[in-house]
Swiss-Prot record:
Protein name: Holliday junction branch migration complex subunit RuvB
Superkingdom of the organism of origin: Bacteria
Subcellular location, principal: cytoplasm
Binding site residues for DNA: 315, 320
Molecular-function annotations in GO: ATP binding; ATP hydrolysis activity; four-way junction DNA binding; four-way junction helicase activity
InterPro entries (alphabetical): AAA+_ATPase, AAA_lid_4, DNA_helicase_Holl-junc_RuvB, P-loop_NTPase, RuvB-like_N, RuvB_C, WH-like_DNA-bd_sf, WH_DNA-bd_sf
Keyword Secreted: no
Subunit structure: Homohexamer. Forms an RuvA(8)-RuvB(12)-Holliday junction (HJ) complex. HJ DNA is sandwiched between 2 RuvA tetramers; dsDNA enters through RuvA and exits via RuvB. An RuvB hexamer assembles on each DNA strand where it exits the tetramer. Each RuvB hexamer is contacted by two RuvA subunits (via domain III) on 2 adjacent RuvB subunits; this complex drives branch migration. In the full resolvosome a probable DNA-RuvA(4)-RuvB(12)-RuvC(2) complex forms which resolves the HJ.
Length: 347
């Protein structure tokens, strides 16, 4: 049968947010949030302590690959604090005035969430320094020789920043966060629980083996798990099935081109390129991106994290290397050092 993907050019297993992702399935409180146990425990303690002291919660940085629940966790923190949350993102804050307008309109106890904070303009970022430390901001009034700076006192607030590339944050900004959490990929058991809960919220029953099959293909990412569940539910509905079965899951995955490892055609293309064109590597990011016809950021932020985490690619000082697992996955023969002639034969 022909493979289908109703997302058009968007990958069904992309961890990036799409217009098809549903906010209604997200947990609202820490008690409903599955996974990231260490982070949850630390947050519970910090939130409880801030409430008992009547103080503002420390600023928080949430770091990790896309789709792991950074936005969801920021919303949960606001809910736990019974606070209003204001959402923006680094790329749209182009001028200092854009951020100053948001900061001066915050009320006491509010939460400001800045997604992709690493992409914020450096001039804009400087306004955050005094805002985070002293709850005040200097605003320039007028232009030219008549311009003057006035200091505006801000209401106490909590800033939550989210980043997929914490290494791009400047030290002055990073050092102003009281708590920094590195979010990890989810286990299959955690994803199975997330899928089962989401199916229940959707009003759908799902067999345990079916939920586990989806979890195995979800690349350690809840956003992908929910997206796959929705597509499986579609076929289940069309078939008139009372619950989602393993057979239905496997049929949908074949149609979507997602294998039992959660890899799709682009993942396989990346691995084949490293092995066939670059003899298994090492290959630099720039060269790999040029060969694949995609941007370096797309490789490093979207594809690589899972391929590295799952052991198909290793990264070193000289570049990316296809692992023995990648060779075996694609059915290639290898020598120590990864020599390969492109046709499954050893050179």
């Amino acid at each position: 049968m022909e493979k289908i993907n109703e997302y058009g050019s968007e990958r069904i297993v992309s961890p990036e947010r799409t217009g098809y992702d549903s906010y209604s399935l997200r947990p609202k409180f820490l008690s409903e949030y599955i996974g990231q146990e260490n982070i949850k425990e630390r947050l519970k303690l910090a939130i409880q302590a801030s409430k008992m002291r009547g103080e503002q919660l420390d600023h928080i940085l949430l770091a990790g690959p896309p789709g792991l629940g950074k936005t969801t966790l920021a919303t949960i923190i606001a809910n736990e604090l019974n606070a209003n949350i204001h959402v923006t993102s680094g790329p749209i804050l182009e001028k200092q005035g854009d951020l100053a307008a948001i900061l001066t309109n915050l009320e006491a106890g509010d939460v400001l969430f800045i997604d992709e904070i690493h992409r914020m303009n450096r001039n804009v970022e400087e306004i955050l320094y005094s805002a985070m430390e002293d709850f005040q901001v200097d605003i320039m009034i007028g232009k030219g020789p008549a311009a003057r700076s006035i200091r505006v006192e801000l209401q106490p607030f909590t800033l939550i920043g989210a980043t997929t590339r914490s290494g791009l944050l400047t030290s002055p900004l990073r050092n102003r966060f009281g708590m920094i959490f590195e979010m990890n990929f989810y286990t299959q058991e955690e994803l199975k629980m997330i899928i089962t809960r989401a199916a229940e919220v959707m009003g759908t029953l799902i067999d345990d083996d079916a939920a586990l099959s989806i979890a195995k293909r979800s690349r350690g990412t809840p956003r992908i798990a929910i997206r796959l569940l929705k597509r499986v539910r579609d076929l289940s509905t069309v078939r008139g099935s009372e619950n989602i079965t393993l057979n239905i899951v496997e049929e949908v995955m074949r149609l979507l081109g997602v294998d039992e490892f959660g890899l799709d055609e682009m993942d396989r293309k990346i691995l084949k390129t490293i092995i066939e064109i670059y003899k298994g590597g090492p290959v630099g990011l720039k060269s790999l991106a040029a060969s694949l016809g995609i941007t370096e950021d797309t490789i490093s932020e979207v594809y690589e994290p899972f391929l590295v985490q799952s052991g198909f690619i290793a990264r070193g000082a000289r570049g990316r290397i296809a692992t023995e697992k990648a060779y075996k996955y694609l059915g290639y023969n290898t020598l120590p050092g990864g020599l390969f002639d492109g046709f499954g034969n050893i050179e």
